[in-house]
């Protein structure tokens, strides 16, 4: 857990279920127009089914997309899947103001997921060779960030109770044969996505040494 940084609270926005592209565009607009006084924000969302291809993505890792749309995006990393039953947390953080290194933010995101899973009795770990969070040899959370104008966007996606079949249509994050898992298969009493999303936001805030302020309005 990080020490309290003395920064203002992070605004917590719950977006519900949204298509990917409008949320991505809203993240970019927020990042491009924010200034030194703009609040940091966490966005919690579930996306409609979509494959997103990161800047390092290769076409050969997209095996059989079928009817699921493919979006070439500007985050780091390679291809992944988003869909209902998966909690996505986007940390829109002024990393310069917070004196936060990219590796530090990545580690905070991974540790937040690890802490959440530990609270439910699941042992998980990060891997130095493949960003994300793993339970044994299976992947439960994917991670991809972008830093622009000294601020972060994109984030982390945690599989809670969604359909994992679409992951078989890709090489997740560029790793052929990567097995995926989800929280509902690892615990006897799995919370719903909304509860897990709030837990994840709280875990990440603790890692960053920040407080959260829930917001009634959504930014996108």
Curated annotation (Swiss-Prot):
PROSITE patterns given for it?
BPL_LPL_CATALYTIC, LIPB
- Residues annotated as domain BPL/LPL catalytic: 36-212
Q: Which residues bind substrate?
A: 75-82, 142-144, 155-157
**In the UniProt record, does the keyword Transferase occur?**
yes
Keyword annotations from UniProtKB, A to Z: Acyltransferase, Cytoplasm, Transferase
- UniProt GO MF annotations: lipoyl(octanoyl) transferase activity
The cross-references to Gene3D superfamilies, in alphabetical order and at most eight, read: Bira Bifunctional Protein, Domain 2 (3.30.930.10)
Pfam families associated with the record: LplA-B_cat
Where is this protein found? Cytoplasm
Which reaction does this chain catalyze?
octanoyl-[ACP] + L-lysyl-[protein] = N(6)-octanoyl-L-lysyl-[protein] + holo-[ACP] + H(+)
Matches recorded under SUPFAM superfamilies: Class II aaRS and biotin synthetases (SSF55681)
Q: What pathway is this protein a component of? A: Protein modification; protein lipoylation via endogenous pathway; protein N(6)-(lipoyl)lysine from octanoyl-[acyl-carrier-protein]: step 1/2
Gene Ontology BP annotations: protein modification process
Active-site residues per Swiss-Prot or TrEMBL entry: 173 (acyl-thioester intermediate)
Enumerate the residues marked as the site Lowers pKa of active site Cys: 139
Please provide, in alphabetical order, the Gene Ontology terms of the cellular component aspect for this entry. cytoplasm
User: Could you tell me which InterPro entries the record lists for this protein?
Assistant: aa-tRNA-synth_II/BPL/LPL (IPR045864), BPL_LPL_catalytic (IPR004143), Octanoyltransferase (IPR000544), Octanoyltransferase_CS (IPR020605)
The Enzyme Commission number assigned here is 2.3.1.181
Purpose of the protein: Catalyzes the transfer of endogenously produced octanoic acid from octanoyl-acyl-carrier-protein onto the lipoyl domains of lipoate-dependent enzymes. Lipoyl-ACP can also act as a substrate although octanoyl-ACP is likely to be the physiological substrate.
The record's family statement is: Belongs to the LipB family.
Query: What's the further remark here?
Result: In the reaction, the free carboxyl group of octanoic acid is attached via an amide linkage to the epsilon-amino group of a specific lysine residue of lipoyl domains of lipoate-dependent enzymes.
Instruction: Give the protein's recorded name.
Output: Octanoyltransferase
Native species: Chromohalobacter salexigens (strain ATCC BAA-138 / DSM 3043 / CIP 106854 / NCIMB 13768 / 1H11)
Upper classification of the source organism reads: Bacteria, Pseudomonadati, Pseudomonadota, Gammaproteobacteria, Oceanospirillales
